[in-house]
A protein has these predicted regions:
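Accessory beta-strand-rich segments of carbohydrate-active enzymes
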Residues: 3-17, 40-41, 45-153, 183, ...
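Extended acidic/polar, glycine-enriched regions
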Residues: 102-108, 177-259, 611-612
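An acidic-aromatic loop/edge-strand motif
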Residues: 7-9, 15, 26-40, 100-172, ...
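Compositionally biased low-complexity segments at domain edges in trafficked proteins
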Residues: 145-149, 153-169, 264-284, 640-672, ...
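Extended substrate-binding grooves/exosites of carbohydrate-active enzymes
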Residues: 27-38, 84, 118, 123, ...
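Extracellular ectodomain segments of secreted/surface proteins
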Residues: 46-58, 154-170, 549-573, 642-643, ...
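Structural beta-strand segments of beta-rich domains
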Residues: 64-66, 170-176, 571-575
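Compact, charge-rich alpha-helical regulatory domains located at protein termini
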Residues: 662-734, 738, 745
Length: 746
């Protein structure tokens, strides 16, 4: 029988280039757990060599095969047994295995896995707005099987494919195919289907060289986000009265559709998908997460009331997909074809292989409804080769899995018509109106305009959000002040905008959790993206978390916002309450302030007493309370210092323009720099780049430096494109930048 042996203990990690001393580690492990998010501006991208010994497992009968299974190695790996290469693998997010039987010897065997998170010419991701952690961050197993066994070689797959389909009479057919290695005429495959309660409801037997079958189950219980009923399909490789190998798959019976006007429906019921995106890292663990970490994340998302998760921007752990199956989430699973397109045959082969691994390894998960083929890939521009690659990926998805829909996440400046549309079954945009530029109120009109111009496209929003840092607070929140209040205000608008538009097939907040991004330095916090609804340590649910809980959660809830804005000045202060109940009553120090009937967001003007005040909100059977202190002057530490500095810098920038008419048509004289030049081109001239870098910093709070941070992702962009992405510059700003650049000769 199959035996799976964990090899997570007792590894030695050394660095051949000598960046760090050798150490003993336990898997899951990453060498970037700290420097990948500590804000020092860079992190170790190198090769690490993991090594340990093992004893060859022995099957009861003669023979048998031994495999090493690597659950993920970031970003590429070479596996050796006793000094001989067993396999190599490019791609940091998928399972891969190697048959090492013939490399093993009696007694101790040495297993070494060389792992690198350095960039390579053909591998994705090339550059992106998150840390590329290095290491064996999911674990390693030995798998011992008889000579005849269910397949372990094909793209890291599970050896079985199950396609449940509901039937008109309330039953379901389970189309099953398993893959047997080294079968002979004496073997059969026995299938058993167990219902969500563990009772066998159907079975069948097939010859081992022709395993495909369709099994009917009456009165099938459907899988949905509200009722995630799971069936278990067990496959046993049988000879006489002995089971030689056994595998299983947890699956769900469901059907779903997406239409441009009706949005998403599951099992015939209209159900707008409203949820979040998620990265796989945690404070000072990096991406080396345990099973408990994955399930904790899924439980917090369930607490939010979300029914969908976009798993960005790569294949996630089987543990998390399992959690989504069990808890009921509609999952968007994608490959790291992101930001920067790499030209050439090798890069094309690599991205196709990543899609094959994603689909083959995850085909049985009922939670996965959408395969995502790329994210913001036009950041570096468009080419026919890029478009053709998308068509190739779409074709591949349909060949491997005709049962699911495909999707894409367009960068904001992707034209609303053109060759990138109508490739995938459904589409989404990443938009940040109200954060990187523009106004929150632009979001709704943009959605309506796109829908009117493209009535045949199923439209979703795959990313939207803004940073919220729980140190910063404001009574008058503004874009780019990084306050918890502005983040909540932003999401109040967005939650309502999507509720008003059920035809938006899915919306995904960017992001559920703050996450590591070593290149970032924003809002006084370095090394992280702080757009999460929950902090990176999972300790604090920001006020914006409760905005969505009020809109999405089914259980009664009430939450008083602003509890970290604990010291308030003024005769009165605004107190916001979020609730999914119709009516909220607020009390201050036991006295009723008022009762309001509203939709999700309740606002009260409260006259605080001197000193400390206890506020309590009551909504039907639920209540919440906070304590506020009335003070003469609110602490200066509530305001991000650089917010005022940047506002002053923008004002000074315009003063330098004098009386120039910034409404006049822009000019682009030949032989001079302009906003049409890429950052890479502008960097060739010290003066031109200094002007551009200052403009970008003032308008977006991004520091751009050649060779540092997100330079690889941004270098092909022009200031003109950046401005067009999301109205990124203040009015007149791009014109003033161009006016300065056209004075600088190339």
């Amino acid at each position: 029988m199959r035996e799976i042996i964990s090899l997570n203990e007792g590894w030695t990690l050394r660095f051949p280039k000598g960046e760090r001393a050798a150490e003993t580690v336990t898997l899951p492990h990453t060498w970037n757990a700290v420097d990948g998010m500590d804000g020092n501006g860079s992190y170790l991208r190198t090769t690490g060599v993991y090594s340990r010994t093992f004893k060859k497992p022995v099957q009861p009968l003669a023979g048998g095969r031994v495999y090493v299974e690597v659950l993920a190695a970031a970003l590429d790996a070479t596996v050796k047994v006793n000094g001989t290469v067993a396999t190599t693998h490019e791609g940091g997010f998928s399972i891969f295995r190697a048959d090492i039987t013939d490399l093993c010897r009696d007694g101790d065997n040495e297993l070494t896995i060389e792992v690198s998170n350095e960039d390579t010419p053909s591998m994705y991701p090339a550059s992106a707005d998150f840390t590329f952690y290095g290491g064996l961050y999911r674990g390693v197993n030995l798998i011992s099987v008889p000579n005849a066994h269910f397949d372990l070689d094909y793209y890291g797959g599970p050896g079985i494919m199950v396609t449940p389909k509901p039937t008109a009479d309330g039953g379901a057919t389970f189309e099953i195919k398993s893959f047997v290695t080294n079968p002979d005429d004496s073997f059969t495959v026995m299938y058993s289907i167990e219902d969500p309660y563990g009772c066998e409801v159907a079975s069948a037997v097939r010859p081992s060289d022709n395993t495909a079958i369709s099994i009917y189950v009456p009165d099938a219980e459907l899988w949905s986000m509200d009722e995630p009923n799971l069936y278990t399909v067990v496959a046993r490789l049988q000879r006489n009265n002995e089971a030689f190998d056994e595998i299983y798959a947890n699956v769900g019976v469901r059907s779903y559709t997406v239409t441009p006007d009706g949005g998403f429906a599951i099992n015939g019921e209209a159900t707008p998908l409203r949820g979040v995106s998620r990265h796989q890292d945690k404070l000072y663990k990096g991406n080396a997460l345990t099973v408990e970490d994955h399930y904790q994340d899924a439980q917090i998302i369930k607490e939010l009331g979300a029914n969908t998760i976009r798993l960005a921007h790569y294949q996630h752990s089987q543990d998390f997909y399992d959690a989504c199956d069990e808890l009921g989430f509609a999952v968007w699973a994608e490959i790291p074809f992101i930001s920067v397109f790499k030209s050439g045959k090798d890069a094309h082969t690599h991205v196709m292989e990543e899609m094959k691994e994603l689909i083959i390894q995850n085909y049985n998960h009922p939670s996965i409804l959408f395969w995502g083929i790329s994210n913001e890939i036009l950041i570096g521009g468009i080419s026919q080769e890029l478009v053709d690659t998308h068509h190739d990926l779409q074709k591949l998805c349909k060949e491997l899995d005709p049962t699911r829909l495909t999707t894409i996440a367009h960068v904001s400046h992707t034209p609303t018509s053109g060759p990138m549309h109508r490739i995938t079954d459904v589409e989404s945009y990443n938009h940040y109106f109200g954060w990187y530029g523009g106004k929150i109120e632009q979001n709704g009109p943009w959605l309506d305009k796109f829908h009117a111009e493209n009535p045949d496209i199923c439209l979703g929003i795959s990313e939207y959000g803004c940073e919220g840092i729980i140190n910063w607070h404001s009574n008058t929140p503004q874009c780019k002040d990084y306050s918890e209040e502005y983040q909540a205000l932003y999401h109040e608008y967005m939650a309502q905008a999507f509720e008003d538009r059920p035809w938006i097939w899915a919306s995904h907040v960017w992001n559920m959790f703050d996450f590591g991004c070593a290149a970032r330095s924003e809002g006084g916090v370095k090394g992280r993206n702080n757009k999460g609804l929950v902090t990176i340590d999972r300790k604090t649910r920001k006020d914006s978390f409760y905005v969505y809980q009020a809109y999405w959660a089914k259980d009664p809830m009430v939450h008083i916002a602003g509890r970290r804005h604990a010291q308030r000045a003024g005769e009165t202060t605004e107190v916001k309450v979020y609730s999914n109940q119709d009516t909220v009553t607020l009390y201050c120090n036991g006295k009723e302030v008022g009762t309001q009937t509203a939709h999700r967001v309740f606002k009260f003007d409260v006259a605080l007493d001197e000193g400390f005040n206890v506020l309590m909100a009551v909504a039907d059977t639920v209540k919440d309370s906070i304590t506020l202190e009335k003070v003469e002057t609110e602490p200066a530490c509530y305001t991000l210092p650089e917010f005022n500095e940047r506002q002053e810098g923008v004002a000074n920038w315009f003063k330098q323009m004098g009386s120039m008419d910034l409404t006049a048509p822009m000019e682009f004289p030949e032989g001079y720099y302009s906003i049409k030049d890429s950052l890479e081109e502008l960097a060739k001239n010290e003066e031109a780049f200094a002007v551009t870098a200052k403009a970008v910093k003032l308008a977006t709070n991004f520091d751009i430096k050649p060779g540092e941070g997100m330079w690889a992702m941004m270098k092909k962009m022009t200031p003109e494109v950046m401005a067009g992405m999301i109205s990124i510059m203040p009015d007149g700003f791009i014109e003033s930048l161009n006016a300065k650049l056209i004075k600088i000769k190339k």
